[in-house]
């Protein structure tokens, strides 16, 4: 009794029972063995539900194997025995849970997948149904959580079996393969060792494909998982040392033990990613002796975590401080260990400044959808945000997805939708799979812009994205500036980027329509923001500055600003539009003239003698466009007369405020280059959206207008 049923004699008796299950027996003999095991479990429950879990684990493994027997009678007996093990465990804990049995069933299943051919087939599924039926028909536990807990366990088992079978089918589809492994890792949330195994496997796939940010996030989740496990293990030890006077409450004990070596658990990593809260869902088993996870393992994982973040260029001082504070060796005073850890962290710390200026250049997001129930099945109509590494062009992403699904379904059955507009599935031919792709940008509201002051913060932990589509009230896509409207779509993903996966489903979306004068305000605000951002950079990119200037003041390409001014600010037209919008557009134009003047001054300071003539030409063009705008806008525009800052829309304020400390490093530079400067090869980020649908329909969002602009390098016409 003192050893909780784990005496040498009990071990020998149990091994005899287990031997009957391990060796081939007659049907009648096995039925008697199941009856005897049921009696053993009933008489000695502490053997299976307290202390070491090895006997419970061995029994679960053999009984699960019998659940796959060719004989229906054996499958029924095995299913009923497994149900009895769960039910008895539930009663033993005072009708609270059967965590011990739950955990050992999941662990045994993972071993069976590797050891037993055909596990998970029809026979095994029938056994799972028998277990569910037993739970549903058991009246004694009708008003408890037991029945739902049993359903949850069988659902997890089915998820593991289905994902394992599908992995071979999708071994050439990295996104789907990672999704399947993620579903396994999620199903093993109650089993730290197995969850770590699948997260490590996901990290290897990401490294192989060059998705270093996602690999780093896998390392972060693994490290947080181990930290959380050690926190709870410490709480269990504290409970054993000082048994509580009141009824047992693991949560209260855990709170008391937070002052120990592992006082924070996974919450210490929340500064790196809010997605880390997933690791807090770990189920607890006081008797589980997992000797693999200890302080040394955590130290190794912390080093791996820092190295992974450094390689992904996603380090900053705050992240390293979090890793530092999570390290028990920093607190325990071990000189050699502390010296080694500081040496490991020195390299990332020394690179933090450089990394912050380049981190934004590692993004490429693709939100999207697939159309075609007959091909994509459960994926039909789903929208995803994809994150692609660094300078991946939109055309390359589209071609990769087209080839991927062409290989799966046949090239004659897959089509790309060359349009970013909304697709009605009823208009699609059910014989084909359709893919639709479009480019998106990060979206921040005013509060987020105030909180995300650094460039790093604006390309890390991003959850909302935006794309725009031009339209007119007459139904045409393009029209004159006085009739050109724009629909802005804001997408919210389920998780923040970067994540352990490179594609994340879209949770919901919000649409906002901009009328013609609002489009003018939006487009002109972008021009002002671009010029301000370039002029305020620590290292001004003179080539980009001159290109932006030329696109703003040169006579041959100034149709955009002048067209907006004539359409909305001319005395004969202003009465058609709301006074507040007209006033705002006038203010934006004043800022535009001021920004052009500032950009000319910066350019004049940087140029050499061979560009003096070019500078004088741009100054002359600037004076000309300023004069024309002054003739249109009342009161007249005079440079320097109004220093008030324009109140830009929230999504544009980031352009106004951001500072480019390194050429081509900002996320929104690439976004804007898709509109006005598509030919810049050094810019580093892109966001896109992909939508799939199958009836043999795959819906892929694809900005044809942007691709055309990238092909000819010209600035877009007004309202495009």
UniProtKB/Swiss-Prot annotation:
Annotated localization: Endomembrane system
Region spans: Interaction with CDC42: 277-638
Pfam family name, one: DHR-2_Lobe_B
Subcellular location, principal: membrane
Domain DOCKER: 186-638
InterPro entries the UniProt entry points to: DOCK (IPR026791), DOCK_C_lobe_A (IPR043161), DOCK_C_lobe_C (IPR043162), DOCKER_dom (IPR027357), DOCKER_Lobe_A (IPR046769), DOCKER_Lobe_B (IPR046770), DOCKER_Lobe_C (IPR046773)
GO molecular function, one term: guanyl-nucleotide exchange factor activity
Cellular compartments per GO CC: endomembrane system; membrane
Keyword tags: Guanine-nucleotide releasing factor, Membrane
A biological-process GO annotation: positive regulation of GTPase activity
Anything else known: 'Zizim' means 'spike' in Hebrew.
Domain topic, free-text comment: The DOCKER domain is necessary and sufficient for the GEF activity.
Subunit relationships: Homodimer. Interacts preferentially with nucleotide-depleted CDC42.
Family stated for the protein in its record: Belongs to the DOCK family.
Task of the protein: Guanine nucleotide-exchange factor (GEF) that activates CDC42 by exchanging bound GDP for free GTP. Overexpression induces filopodia formation.
The protein, known as: Dedicator of cytokinesis protein 9
């Amino acid at each position: 009794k003192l050893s909780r049923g784990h005496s040498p004699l009990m071990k020998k008796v149990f091994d005899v029972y287990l031997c009957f299950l391990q060796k081939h027996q007659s049907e009648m003999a096995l039925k008697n063995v199941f009856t005897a095991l049921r009696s053993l479990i009933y008489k000695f429950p502490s053997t299976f539900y307290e202390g070491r879990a090895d006997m419970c684990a061995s029994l679960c493994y053999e009984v699960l194997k019998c659940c796959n027997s060719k004989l229906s009678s054996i499958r029924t007996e095995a299913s009923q025995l497994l149900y009895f093990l769960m039910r008895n465990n539930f009663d033993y804990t005072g009708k609270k849970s059967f965590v011990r049995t739950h955990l050992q069933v999941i662990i045994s299943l993972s071993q069976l997948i590797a050891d037993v051919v055909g596990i998970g087939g029809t026979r095994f599924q029938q056994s799972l149904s028998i277990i569910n039926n037993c739970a549903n028909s058991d009246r004694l536990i009708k008003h408890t959580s037991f029945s739902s807990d049993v359903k949850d366990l069988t659902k997890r088992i089915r998820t593991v079996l289905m994902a394992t079978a599908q992995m071979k089918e999708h071994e050439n589809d990295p996104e789907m393969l990672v999704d399947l492994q993620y579903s396994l890792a999620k199903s093993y949330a109650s089993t730290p060792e197995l969850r770590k195994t699948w997260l490590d496997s996901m990290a290897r796939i990401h490294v192989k494909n060059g998705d270093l940010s996602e690999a780093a996030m896998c390392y972060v989740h693994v490290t947080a998982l181990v930290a959380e496990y050690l926190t709870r293990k410490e709480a269990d030890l504290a409970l054993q040392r000082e048994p509580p006077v009141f009824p047992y409450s693991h949560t209260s004990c855990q709170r008391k033990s937070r002052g120990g070596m592992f006082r924070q658990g996974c919450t210490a990593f929340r500064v790196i990613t809010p997605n880390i809260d997933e690791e807090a869902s770990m189920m607890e088993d006081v008797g589980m002796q997992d000797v693999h996870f200890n302080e040394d393992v955590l130290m190794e994982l912390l080093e791996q975590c820092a190295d992974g973040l450094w390689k992904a260029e996603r380090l900053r001082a705050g992240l390293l401080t979090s890793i530092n504070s999570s390290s028990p060796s920093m607190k325990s005073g071990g000189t050699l260990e502390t010296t080694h850890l500081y040496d490991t962290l020195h390299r990332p710390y020394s690179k933090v400044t450089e990394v912050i200026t380049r981190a934004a250049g590692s993004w490429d997001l693709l939100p999207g959808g697939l159309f075609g129930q007959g091909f994509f099945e459960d994926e039909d109509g789903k929208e995803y945000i994809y994150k692609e590494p660094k300078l991946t062009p939109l055309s390359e992403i589209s071609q990769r997805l087209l080839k991927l699904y062409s290989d799966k379904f046949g090239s004659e059955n897959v089509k790309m939708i060359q349009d970013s507009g909304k697709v009605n599935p009823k208009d699609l031919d059910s014989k084909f799979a359709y893919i639709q792709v479009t480019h998106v940008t990060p979206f921040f509201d005013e509060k987020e812009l105030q909180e995300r002051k650094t460039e790093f913060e604006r390309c890390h932990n991003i959850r909302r994205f935006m794309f725009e589509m031009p339209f007119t009230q007459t139904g045409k896509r393009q029209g004159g500036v006085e009739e050109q409207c724009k629909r802005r779509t804001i997408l919210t993903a389920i998780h923040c980027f970067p994540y352990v996966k490179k594609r994340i489903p879209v949770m919901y979306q919000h649409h906002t329509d901009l009328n013609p004068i609002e489009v003018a305000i939006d487009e002109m605000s972008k021009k002002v923001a671009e010029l301000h951002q370039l002029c305020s950079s620590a290292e001004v990119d003179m080539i980009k500055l001159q290109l932006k200037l030329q696109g703003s003041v040169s006579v041959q390409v100034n149709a955009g600003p002048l067209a907006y001014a004539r359409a909305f600010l001319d005395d004969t037209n202003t009465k058609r539009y709301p006074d507040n919008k007209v006033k705002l557009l006038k203010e934006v134009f004043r800022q535009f003239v001021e920004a052009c003047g500032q950009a000319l001054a910066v350019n004049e300071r940087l140029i050499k003698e061979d560009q003096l003539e070019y500078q004088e030409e741009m100054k002359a063009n600037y004076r000309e466009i300023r004069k024309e705008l002054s003739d249109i806008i009342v009161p007249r525009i005079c440079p320097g007369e109004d220093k008030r800052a324009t109140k830009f829309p929230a999504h544009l304020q980031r352009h106004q405020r951001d500072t480019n400390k390194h050429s081509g490093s900002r996320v929104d530079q690439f976004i804007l280059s898709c509109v006005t400067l598509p030919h810049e090869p050094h810019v580093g980020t892109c966001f896109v959206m992909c939508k799939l649908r199958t009836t043999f329909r795959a819906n892929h969002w694809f900005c044809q207008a942007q691709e055309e602009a990238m092909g000819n390098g010209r600035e877009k016409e007004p309202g495009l």
